[in-house]
Amino acid sequence: AFSGILADADVAAALKACEAADSFNYKAFFAKVGLTAKSADDIKKAFFVIDQDKSGFIEEDELKLFLQVFSAGARALTDAETKAFLKAGDSDGDGAIGVDEWAALVKA
């Protein structure tokens, strides 16, 4: 899903680092997969991969399954992780993360 954007080894290492429930930290994850160092274009491409229903927003249900977008065998985020992730990214309070909010979150 992220070929040409992220290195497989970086993705594997990032997923391994948050295998345990409630160990997910979006800043650490973005750094480990190499997303924070990417161009604005690549960060937008990643958004559209994660926006599974192509609504133009990443909703709570998509955030819950965020890790599985990187690897089908990865765990779902816990409710606490999902809510914290959404709260961090949803700067306008509409209950979803838009592409500009996503870009700001990745670079935060």
Swiss-Prot record:
Q: What Pfam families does this protein's entry cite?
A: EF-hand_7
Q: Which InterPro entries match?
A: EF-hand-dom_pair (IPR011992), EF_Hand_1_Ca_BS (IPR018247), EF_hand_dom (IPR002048), Parvalbumin (IPR008080)
Summarize where Ca(2+) 1 binds, as residue positions: D51, D53, S55, F57, E59, E62
UniProt-recorded Gene Ontology molecular function terms: calcium ion binding
Residues binding Ca(2+) 2 are: D90, D92, D94, A96, E101
Residue numbers bearing the N-acetylalanine modification: A1
| Annotated Gene Ontology cellular component terms | cytoplasm
**EF-hand domain residues:** 38-73, 77-108
Q: Which UniProt keywords apply?
A: Acetylation, Calcium, Metal-binding, Muscle protein, Repeat
Function, as annotated: In muscle, parvalbumin is thought to be involved in relaxation after contraction. It binds two calcium ions.
Other known facts: This parvalbumin has an isoelectric point of 4.2.
**Which family, according to the similarity comment?**
Belongs to the parvalbumin family.
- Record protein name field: Parvalbumin beta
- Look up and give the organism this protein is from: Merluccius bilinearis (Silver hake)
